[in-house]
């Protein structure tokens, strides 16, 4: 990339009035990891119900998948999709969302103050991932859930044995394991908005036990520790405590300021988060004598600057 006016003989004032940039597509700076192009869906507002999933709609197929939304998502060529949360997951019990939809119990959505029908559950999510050709990334409930529930979920998704939950998956119409590789160890467990909030020491102790047990259930699982913004004391303590047990460490960055320049400069905040997190990961791996440090899962980010009604539903246009 080069400045088009460089060396043109124009004055600085002239250049400032009509700046331009030339991009050379033949100039390669490096290989881009395809998992940069990931997505995240949560049971929040119209994201799932009334968004990508709407039973009985003329716009939906017989599974309830909105065909118009699928057609918009396919060209994005997403690589991985995270579900079911987000804050929602800390009160989500996956067994409510499998089996005949008519028999699934409705539950209170404590994160967002609504009622969850549970009609879009594990099998629907896996089917949606298959439609898009993306890898599923499941976040586990470390708020109100327990280790046994998590292990059962891994078994349901990935076991080829003749065990209870693998057989239940088969009874629900899915003979072969789904092969879900990516599993998040909770969501934002540091926050007082989270059901079952933990401090960093509590989280490390709990996540250590979960990580070891999950690897016994599925040695191929890739585990993601719950991070904050990449430079917090939480991140440092969690990374130090879980290095060697997890494959990735998550960070979440949102910009939500009504101030224009705060939002314009927010990419610097993201760059700083990535840089700080990478340093903490490398430091922890070096101190433990681990040759390969965990990688970064930047699995939540966005810009909100118009929404003020508490719904978190932003309305973007071409100005953005």
Give the role of each language-model region.
Residues 1-232, 240-247, 270-271, 275-299, ...:
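Non-catalytic accessory regions flanking glycosidase/transglycosidase catalytic cores in CAZymes
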Residues 252-266, 310-313:
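Active-site His/acidic residue clusters
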């Amino acid at each position: 990339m080069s400045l088009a006016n460089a060396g043109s003989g124009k004055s600085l004032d002239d250049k400032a009035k009509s700046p331009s940039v030339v991009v050379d597509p033949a100039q390669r700076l490096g290989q881009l990891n395809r998992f940069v192009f990931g997505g995240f869906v949560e049971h929040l507002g119209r994201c799932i119900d009334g968004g990508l999933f709407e039973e009985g709609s003329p716009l939906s197929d017989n599974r309830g998948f909105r065909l118009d939304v699928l057609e918009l998502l396919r060209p994005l060529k997403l690589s991985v999709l995270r579900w079911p949360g987000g804050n929602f997951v800390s009160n989500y019990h996956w067994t409510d969302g499998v089996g005949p939809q008519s028999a699934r119990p409705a539950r209170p959505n404590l994160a967002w103050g609504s009622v969850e029908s549970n009609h879009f559950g594990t099998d629907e999510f896996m089917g949606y991932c298959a439609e898009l050709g993306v890898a599923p990334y499941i976040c586990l409930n470390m708020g109100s859930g327990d280790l046994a529930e998590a292990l059962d979920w891994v078994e349901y998704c990935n076991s080829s044995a003749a065990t209870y939950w693998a057989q239940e998956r088969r009874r629900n119409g899915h003979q072969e394991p789904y092969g879900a590789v990516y599993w998040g160890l909770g969501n934002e467990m540091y926050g007082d908005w989270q059901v079952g909030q933990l401090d960093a020491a509590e989280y490390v102790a709990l996540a250590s036990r979960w990580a070891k047990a999950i690897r016994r259930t599925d040695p191929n699982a890739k585990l993601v520790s719950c991070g904050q913004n990449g430079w917090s004391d939480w991140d440092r303590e969690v990374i130090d405590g879980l290095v060697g047990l997890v494959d990735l460490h998550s960070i979440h960055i949102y910009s939500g300021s009504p101030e224009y320049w705060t939002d314009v400069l927010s990419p610097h905040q993201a760059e700083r988060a990535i840089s700080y997190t990478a340093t903490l990961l490398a430091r922890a791996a070096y101190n433990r004598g681990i040759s390969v440090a965990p990688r970064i899962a930047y699995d939540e980010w966005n810009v909100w600057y118009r929404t003020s009604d508490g719904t978190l539903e932003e309305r973007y246009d071409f100005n953005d």
